[in-house]
Amino acid sequence: AGKLHAIAQDLALIQAMGVKLVLVHGFRPQVNEQLQAKGHEARYSHGIRITDSVALDCAQEAAGQLRYEIEAAFSQGLPNTPMAGATVRIISGNFLTARPVGIMDGVDFQHSGLVRKVDTAGITRTLDMGALVLLSPFNYSPTGEAFNLSMEEVATSVAIELQADKLIFMTEVPGIRIQPGEPASDDNPIDTELPLAAAQALLKQLPPAQVPTDTGFYLQHCVKACKAGVERSHILPFKTDGALLLEIYVHDGIGTMVIDEK
């Protein structure tokens, strides 16, 4: 919760500088925690959660709880700063429709979904009103069926549809190292800038990503976004205080930026 409040303060500051923000939250740790409490195993395939009815209930509960926590974090303003008392207006809604993942390689993903459509006009109108748009990975099909999507899939799809200037992932990993897979050291620091061609070449060398700590997990989404017109995609560590501000406003940044240098 403390980290959420700090990130909310950074986002409030960035928005006050005139940046239009769409925030997509995840809920993977919360769902896994609930499943564990119920004695139910978390199952994945192809890097996607297999969402049975128990996992779907957990996802719905986590989505609701996180929305309240995020709205609370943004309602606290910035004490002891010139922005004390300033509130960020947050609007969330059914800006997305979902479709089922279906069956892949004989695996039935049940209630796991992908983005079917993004209401870009609705999101743009909301941003133009000066509000921050909050999106959840819990979404519905045109027939009202509930689906559990991944935060990465939602964020990437929305960034592409909006043709956003940046796609930023706040992640468990610090970024991508010069020598991926090798231990962190002075000789193997974070690669702060990765041209799109180099990122694509690296993806081909890596094994398919299955979990968020795999090097290629966020990189594949960064590459997808850059190929589709989003000029810059970033992988940042959420544990580092001020990571967003450092990445956006300091020349060398702090995580890894994938850039399309066209």
Write out the residue ranges for each language-model feature:
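Long, charged amphipathic helices and adjacent flexible linkers at domain junctions
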Residues: 249-262
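Ligand-binding beta-strand-loop-alpha-helix segment within the catalytic cores
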Residues: 32, 36-134
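Structural motif
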Residues: 1, 22, 102, 132-136, ...
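Glycine-rich beta-strand-to-loop/alpha-helix junction loops that act as flexible
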Residues: 1, 23-28, 172, 238
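N-terminal glycine-/serine-/threonine-rich phosphate-binding loop
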Residues: 1-22
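Glycine-rich phosphate/pyrophosphate-binding loops
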Residues: 162-180, 233-236
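Polyanion-binding loop/helix "lid" in catalytic or ligand-binding cores
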Residues: 7, 11, 50-82, 120-121, ...
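Short acidic, glycine/serine/threonine-rich loops at helix termini
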Residues: 32-39, 100-102, 145-147, 178-183, ...
